[in-house]
């Protein structure tokens, strides 16, 4: 069964309402404190919502299905229990979606661009991630990261984000694995065919990093997570690059590719 991967609870907060299933980093290891400087935590009064990616001092990219009322963002987080001295908090000044009605599907337009209320200062634990200069190559080894559950079906949320390497597949692999996917879409297919490594509940909106570039956004996948021959589906950042750059440049009427 294919479900959108919305985030569970990070840090010490816990959601009190039902969420869509999201993906976690199952089968990974604790991230090095210096390798997730662009990783953002989105949360509201009910708890943690999603991950996100800082792309410059004023803008964050995450999944459209992570949108919620009155959410905040924390930058520079590593441990839930031991805050970094350089952690910073911001709120959205503006939110942009591919569709003015916030319409998106499991294979199209699951992306949200957030303008921050004030710039984030780069620091020891905070730095933006480069947007892609070219599309990723099938066969690439890519990095996933997040505070999502590291076990499934019983959920275990770690103190620090977990990271794992997964492989980028031809889209036809996901098309064959997940019922309902169209023959083509503006998404990436990534995982481990033998299973055991995957994003999962709590990781939605976070980055898929290939060769040091921000190539994908955690969107959705199989349920349970990390099953053999069921790679995850990630919004393809490169296909939305013109839209992102136009919005940042001030062209707020820019549209996403069809």
UniProtKB/Swiss-Prot annotation:
Q: Do the record's keywords include Ribonucleoprotein? A: no
UniProt domain Peptidase S1: residue ranges: 25-249
Query: So what EC number does this one have?
Result: 3.4.21.-
GO MF annotation terms: serine-type endopeptidase activity; toxin activity
- SUPFAM superfamilies referenced in this protein's UniProt entry, alphabetically: Trypsin-like serine proteases
Q: GO CC terms on record?
A: extracellular region; secretory granule
Against InterPro entries, the record matches this protein to: Peptidase_S1_PA, Peptidase_S1_PA_chymotrypsin, Peptidase_S1A, Trypsin_dom, TRYPSIN_HIS, TRYPSIN_SER
Q: Which family does it belong to?
A: Belongs to the peptidase S1 family. Snake venom subfamily.
Assembly and interaction partners: Monomer.
Q: What is this protein called?
A: Snake venom serine protease 5
Classification of source organism = Eukaryota, Metazoa, Chordata, Craniata, Vertebrata
